């Protein structure tokens, strides 16, 4: 008997034993194994489908998140633009108000200066008039000490008043 080639009787009983085991497995074992493999296949298919759906939902959520971020950035830009426009408007208005207030203050100061100038001129004129009268009085007293010079002065003044101004 060779180790590599079995005898025909041994070969027969090996086929019979194999056939019996195969029939028992085919009748009772394979359906259960096939059922378990099918169940496992169904479970794996369902898991793959759930994973695909989860990936799709994740991609959709990612797109929604990106859209929300883009919308938020756009809104932020709009709000910043409005804030800058409002700031510029407020600054412009404040400058305008400051210019108006400065102009009013300047006008008031100019008016006050003009009033004080007019008052000073009136005061100077009064003082000049008083001084002129005093000087004229002193000059007249000195020049008109006699009656004849007084009468001459009165006549000259009357002539000046009665004749129209030639100047």
UniProtKB/Swiss-Prot annotation:
<keyword id="KW-0138">CF(0)</keyword>
<comment type="similarity">
    <text>Belongs to the ATPase B chain family.</text>
</comment>
<dbReference type="GO" id="GO:0045259">
    <property type="term" value="C:proton-transporting ATP synthase complex"/>
</dbReference>
<dbReference type="Pfam" id="PF00430">
    <property type="entry name" value="ATP-synt_B"/>
</dbReference>
<keyword id="KW-0066">ATP synthesis</keyword>
<dbReference type="GO" id="GO:0005886">
    <property type="term" value="C:plasma membrane"/>
</dbReference>
<keyword id="KW-1133">Transmembrane helix</keyword>
<keyword id="KW-0406">Ion transport</keyword>
<protein>
    <recommendedName>
        <fullName>ATP synthase subunit b</fullName>
    </recommendedName>
</protein>
<keyword id="KW-0472">Membrane</keyword>
<keyword id="KW-0997">Cell inner membrane</keyword>
<dbReference type="InterPro" id="IPR050059">
    <property type="entry name" value="ATP_synthase_B_chain"/>
</dbReference>
<keyword id="KW-0813">Transport</keyword>
<feature type="transmembrane region" description="Helical">
    <location>
        <begin position="14"/>
        <end position="34"/>
    </location>
</feature>
<dbReference type="InterPro" id="IPR005864">
    <property type="entry name" value="ATP_synth_F0_bsu_bac"/>
</dbReference>
<dbReference type="InterPro" id="IPR002146">
    <property type="entry name" value="ATP_synth_b/b'su_bac/chlpt"/>
</dbReference>
<keyword id="KW-0812">Transmembrane</keyword>
<comment type="subunit">
    <text>F-type ATPases have 2 components, F(1) - the catalytic core - and F(0) - the membrane proton channel. F(1) has five subunits: alpha(3), beta(3), gamma(1), delta(1), epsilon(1). F(0) has three main subunits: a(1), b(2) and c(10-14). The alpha and beta chains form an alternating ring which encloses part of the gamma chain. F(1) is attached to F(0) by a central stalk formed by the gamma and epsilon chains, while a peripheral stalk is formed by the delta and b chains.</text>
</comment>
<dbReference type="GO" id="GO:0046933">
    <property type="term" value="F:proton-transporting ATP synthase activity, rotational mechanism"/>
</dbReference>
<comment type="function">
    <text>F(1)F(0) ATP synthase produces ATP from ADP in the presence of a proton or sodium gradient. F-type ATPases consist of two structural domains, F(1) containing the extramembraneous catalytic core and F(0) containing the membrane proton channel, linked together by a central stalk and a peripheral stalk. During catalysis, ATP synthesis in the catalytic domain of F(1) is coupled via a rotary mechanism of the central stalk subunits to proton translocation.</text>
</comment>
<keyword id="KW-1003">Cell membrane</keyword>
<keyword id="KW-0375">Hydrogen ion transport</keyword>
<comment type="function">
    <text>Component of the F(0) channel, it forms part of the peripheral stalk, linking F(1) to F(0).</text>
</comment>
